[in-house]
């Protein structure tokens, strides 16, 4: 472990990146029930239960509105095929509200299985670690006092960029987890729209959107795996006869570009899912 301040600063930024990358892998394999000890999940299920009663009320409202919209007269409603169709729709919508939590949990478990399979097949458990090459360390340690001033500025800028990218990436993954909680909490309201034929599109969009949020985990896992393979070889040092400032600047520039590729892929996971699946 080098005692050089510049080396320590760069290592600290890289450690932050590695920690956030490892945290992403943990979050992707964690269920909402176990996240942060399950306290958020308990609050979410409580809200879901409270909104279920409102969902039943809206169920009747959407059902009645659907009957009025689809049946031109009371005579149409008395037809057996119309009455049976309306009854089946009402029963299915009621069941969806009653077992909505179980249905959403099952959908999440299916996608979680996809994520676990992707990770297991890749053979990676923590996304790999980015380390400062020994050649860079030697170059930095050989720098004199005056030459270290511009090197200090370059290192500070690079460390700041790496740290900011680390937090942007992890915030995106945390945002996905929070969206899962919000979808689960509010679920009875949009699900109740299945009771009416004119309003069922709201429920369909809700299910598709929730499936898209779940699938974001698979896209993020793929992005991390591809990045780990892509960045397995550290940025090339280039001409070792160059000054330490130039070498470090080139190294940080290429490293930040690689990190930007991953951050961009992670942040675009929702858009990628929509383009792939139309969700």
Where are these regions (language model features)?
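Alpha-helical transmembrane segments
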Residues: 191-208, 272-276
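Non-cytosolic segments of integral membrane proteins
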Residues: 93-186, 220, 224-278
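Loop-to-transmembrane-helix entry motif
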Residues: 47-54, 90-94, 171-174, 181, ...
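Binding/recognition "hotspot" determinant
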Residues: 1-58
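Alpha-helical transmembrane segments and their helix-start/interface "positive-inside/aromatic belt" motifs
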Residues: 1-10, 80-100, 203-214, 269
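Hydrophobic transmembrane alpha-helix segments characteristic of membrane transport
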Residues: 58-94, 186-200
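Alpha-helical membrane-interface segments at transmembrane helix boundaries
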Residues: 44-52, 84-88, 92, 141, ...
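Hydrophobic alpha-helical transmembrane segments
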Residues: 53-65, 161-162, 180
């Amino acid at each position: 472990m080098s005692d050089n301040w510049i080396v320590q600063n760069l290592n600290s930024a890289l450690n932050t990146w590695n920690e956030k990358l490892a945290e992403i892998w943990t979050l992707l394999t964690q269920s909402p029930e176990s996240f942060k000890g399950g306290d958020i999940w308990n609050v979410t299920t409580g809200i879901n239960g409270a909104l279920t009663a409102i969902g039943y009320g809206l169920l009747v409202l959407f059902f009645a509105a659907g009957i009025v919209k689809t049946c031109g007269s009371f005579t149409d409603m008395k037809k057996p095929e119309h009455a049976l169709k309306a009854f089946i729709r009402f029963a299915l919508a009621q069941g969806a509200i009653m077992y909505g939590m179980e249905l959403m949990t099952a959908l999440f478990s299916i996608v979680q299985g996809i994520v676990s399979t992707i990770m297991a097949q890749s053979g990676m458990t923590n996304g790999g670690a980015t380390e400062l090459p020994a050649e860079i360390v030697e170059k930095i340690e050989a720098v004199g006092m005056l030459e270290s001033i511009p090197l200090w500025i370059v290192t500070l800028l690079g460390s700041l960029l790496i740290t900011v990218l680390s937090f942007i990436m992890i915030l995106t993954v945390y945002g996905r987890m929070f969206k899962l909680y919000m979808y689960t909490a509010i679920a009875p309201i949009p699900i109740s729209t299945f009771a009416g034929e004119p309003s069922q599109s709201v429920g369909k969009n809700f299910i598709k959107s929730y499936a898209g949020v779940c699938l974001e985990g698979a896209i993020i896992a793929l992005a991390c795996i591809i990045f780990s393979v892509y960045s397995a070889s550290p940025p090339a040092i280039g001409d070792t006869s160059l000054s330490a400032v130039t070498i470090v600047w080139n190294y940080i520039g290429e490293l930040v570009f690689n990190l930007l590729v991953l951050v961009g892929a992670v942040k675009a996971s929702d858009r990628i899912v929509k383009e792939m699946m139309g969700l």
